[in-house]
Amino acid sequence: SGSSIGIKEKLYDNFVKDNRYMYIVKGLGNTIVITIFAVMLGIVLGFLIAIVRTSHDRNGGLAILNGICKAYLTIIRGTPVMIQLLIIYYVVLASVTNKILVAVIAFGLNSAAYVAEIVRSGIMSVDIGQFEAGRSLGLNYSQTMKLVIIPQAVKNILPALLNEFISLLKETSISGYIGMMDLTKGGDIIRSNTYEAFIPLIAVALIYLVIVMLLSHGVSKLERRLRSNER
């Protein structure tokens, strides 16, 4: 009973006293906002990069744009996301005071590099005969891509895009390095107030785990549904 009283006191100190649970609530809200908007930015940019890259692969066009995209992919995929976040915060967007906006841009630019390769592989996985069929119907290149190729590619890559969302959710845990309140930072602030590391950090880990498990379950259900639709 003594140990249960001790645990109750620790839970009270960490979450109830001075409404400390609000650090977790606010942090979780910011984490979700950053992840959603960063993924949206990543998908838009990633699709544009993928279309440039596949256009170059298919017909050799857009050589300069393709070169820029290749350099972008090499830099983003070859450097740690934390360094990218710090460079964007301290150098590129040093005058921007909205830290959530900075984080969205940093994680969105990072995500775009991975989304681009997912989309590109999805487009390339669509049978070349589909492309030729579109052209034979009198559609030009961009119409064929928009009406025939991309709708099929999206179906192929949806699970991979959702997995990218899950990866990005976990990556945002470094947002605290720019002094921003995210879920991880919220737990760390409680730790610094109570000098108790175990309970707040385990709570943060459990929240991430529950969200990731729910999203992973959604991905599995989607994959099963897509497979059953193909039969």
Residue positions per predicted region:
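Transmembrane alpha-helices and adjacent helix-loop boundaries
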Residues: S1-R231
